[in-house]
């Protein structure tokens, strides 16, 4: 019976993913090749260039850009480092530490509990979205910034916007499975910039509501095509580009880059802003044990990190934090070559694992993230720096 239950869960998870592209689509990559018959190997033909930034002199945090690589541990970054020829934008961040990710009731956490600790500074149970262990809603740093500081706020992801990690910053709930309920909470969440996938839970609902129309009635500019992101005007933005998750990187293009830059443009103001950016699908492809797809998602996320760092350097008052909610796949780097930009790996699980994950920081207060912290402490440090 247990085996049947696990199989049903696995099939449900696969159906939630975007459709896997055809092999020919994958071969059109401008920077990489990928062997579909060998999911444990990957080679980059043309690496991307990384940025160089200096630590700003400002000491006060006006803006926070909190970046989460879902399922992205030191293992994934190590593989990406080798595959891109020994270069990553995230390594330009001057401060590094570690975060332990366990939930209150399980050693190996999930995205709801892992994300909730980062978002709120409160450690919680497996499966809970921005609730404390007793089931009470806990205010996230994004929500606190809006309420107390008058900051503008935003989330941009490549998964469903009502999936666990973005939900942890914007809404509350006892289960990630209630995606219609989580989506409905966004109508009154007053988040200024929302970008991702998941239209199925917004306008094809069992209760007949059309949340997209409700958001438009509240003054949101709605965008459903990636090419229209840069053209959007107004003070509030809702972008939903797919029925479920967005497609894998080589098929969707630089959506995360475009949406992140648009978010910064729209949110930047005298009172500051809080923006959460998630590289959502590193986790998905580690669950599937496909290192090539994983690297494509990691590189997409890292290129966004580079542009964020360039903007933060000019601004001088922006704290940038890059971390993960948990590690996925039990990934090991077995062989490879930095010079040849190729890797051979092994996954030990299709699930999460309990390893510490890295924390990188740049900007005012970055030094506070050095060392080893509980994941809830990461959220607490962010709140403390925002409070000064």
Kindly give the residue locations of the regions a language model identified.
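Bacterial Sec-dependent N-terminal signal peptides
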Residues: 1-21
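N-terminal catalytic scaffold of extracellular/periplasmic and nuclease hydrolases
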Residues: 19-198, 203-204, 211-222, 226-229, ...
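Structural motif
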Residues: 66, 239-241, 274-278, 321
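Metal-dependent active-site segment of extracytoplasmic phospho-/sulfohydrolases and closely related
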Residues: 74, 299-338
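Gly-rich Lys/Arg/Thr-decorated short loops/hinges at beta-loop-alpha junctions or inter-strand turns
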Residues: 121-126, 238-248, 283-288, 360-364
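Active-site His/acidic residue clusters
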Residues: 163-170, 243-246, 260, 268-272, ...
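A Trp-anchored, charged/polar loop motif used as the substrate-binding/catalytic surface
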Residues: 221-223, 252-267
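Active-site lining segments that contact anionic ligands and/or coordinate catalytic metals
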Residues: 235, 270-274, 317, 326, ...
């Amino acid at each position: 019976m247990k085996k049947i239950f696990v199989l049903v869960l696995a099939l449900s998870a696969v159906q939630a993913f975007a459709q896997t592209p055809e092999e020919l689509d994958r071969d059109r990559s401008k920077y990489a090749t990928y062997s579909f018959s060998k999911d444990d190997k990957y080679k980059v033909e043309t690496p991307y260039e990384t940025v160089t930034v200096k630590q700003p002199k400002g000491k006060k945090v006006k803006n926070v850009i909190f970046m989460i690589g879902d399922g992205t541990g030191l293992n994934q970054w190590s593989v990406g480092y080798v595959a891109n020829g020994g270069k990553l934008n995230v390594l330009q961040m001057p401060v590094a530490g570690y975060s332990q990710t366990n939930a209150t009731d399980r050693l190996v956490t999930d995205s709801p509990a892992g994300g909730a600790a980062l978002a709120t500074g409160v450690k919680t149970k497996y499966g809970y979205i921005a609730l404390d262990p007793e089931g009470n809603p806990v205010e996230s740093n994004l929500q606190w910034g809006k309420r107390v500081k008058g900051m503008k706020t935003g989330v941009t992801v490549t998964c469903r916007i009502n999936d666990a990690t973005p939900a942890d910053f914007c809404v509350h709930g006892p289960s990630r499975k209630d995606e219609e309920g989580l989506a409905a909470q966004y109508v009154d969440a007053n988040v200024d910039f929302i970008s991702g996938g998941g239209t199925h839970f917004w306008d094809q609902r069992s209760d007949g509501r059309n949340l997209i129309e409700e958001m438009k009635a509240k003054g949101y500019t709605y965008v459903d095509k990636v090419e229209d992101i840069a053209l959007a005007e107004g003070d509030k933005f809702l972008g939903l580009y797919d029925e479920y998750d967005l497609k894998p990187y080589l098929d969707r293009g630089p959506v995360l880059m475009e949406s992140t830059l648009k978010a910064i443009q729209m949110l930047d103001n005298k009172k500051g802003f809080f923006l959460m950016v998630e590289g959502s699908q590193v986790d998905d492809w580690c669950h599937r044990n496909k290192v090539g797809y994983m690297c494509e998602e990691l590189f997409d996320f890292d290129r966004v990190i580079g542009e964020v760092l360039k903007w933060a350097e000019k601004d001088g008052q922006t704290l940038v934090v890059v971390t993960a909610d948990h590690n996925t796949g039990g990934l090991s780097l077995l062989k490879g070559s930095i010079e040849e930009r190729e890797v051979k790996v092994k996954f030990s699980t299709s699930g999460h694992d309990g390893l510490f994950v890295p924390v990188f920081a740049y900007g005012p207060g970055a030094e506070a993230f050095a060392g080893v912290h509980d994941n809830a402490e990461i959220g607490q440090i962010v709140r403390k720096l925002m409070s000064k």
